[in-house]
């Protein structure tokens, strides 16, 4: 596996990102692997490696970069858990879609990535982000998964369900 730790430039700063893909072959379809609330950490890097081993270019970014360079919750520390909830509250679908645009632009510029075939996966906090991204980039997002996603259909202007008709790819909600 090829692995890189890079910063992707966004309008709001540098987004720390882990990218992994197979050593040979390609170009590989892209997977935007969105963090869950505890943050970008080695556990997620391992999951990204498993996905990339099956033939994908996986992009795992720290979505909390606007506030912290890196974050991993320490569940035994109440202050760390409180910080996690504060960081979560600073994200919304539109911000994460802007981040996804930067991730996709980076992948599109990389010859080993096929940014015309994109999958997005989100767990819990990032489940609605995955669906929003599917609606925001319907021509390239071929699949999106929201696993135990929260706030998928709520009485809010940015509820992902309001954009269901814009999603052209396969959608998995579980």
State what each model feature region is.
Residues 1-174:
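N-terminal cap/leader regions of alpha/beta-hydrolase-fold enzymes
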């Amino acid at each position: 596996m090829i692995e890189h730790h890079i910063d992707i430039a966004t309008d709001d700063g540098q987004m720390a990102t882990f990218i992994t893909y197979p050593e040979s072959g390609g170009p590989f379809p892209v997977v935007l692997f969105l963090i869950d609330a505890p943050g970008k950490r080695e556990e997620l890097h391992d999951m990204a490696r498993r996905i990339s081993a099956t033939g994908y270019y996986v992009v795992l970014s720290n979505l909390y970069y606007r506030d912290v360079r890196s974050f991993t919750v320490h569940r035994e520390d109440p202050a760390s858990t409180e910080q996690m909830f504060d960081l979560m509250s600073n994200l919304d679908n539109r911000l994460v879609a802007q981040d996804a645009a930067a991730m996709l632009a980076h992948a599109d510029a990389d010859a080993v990535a096929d940014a015309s075939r994109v999958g997005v996966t989100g767990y819990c906090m990032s489940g609605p982000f995955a669906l929003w991204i599917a609606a925001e980039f319907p021509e390239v997002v071929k699949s999106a998964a929201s696993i135990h996603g929260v706030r998928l259909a709520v009485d809010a202007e940015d509820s992902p369900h309001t954009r269901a008709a814009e999603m052209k790819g396969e959608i998995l909600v579980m």
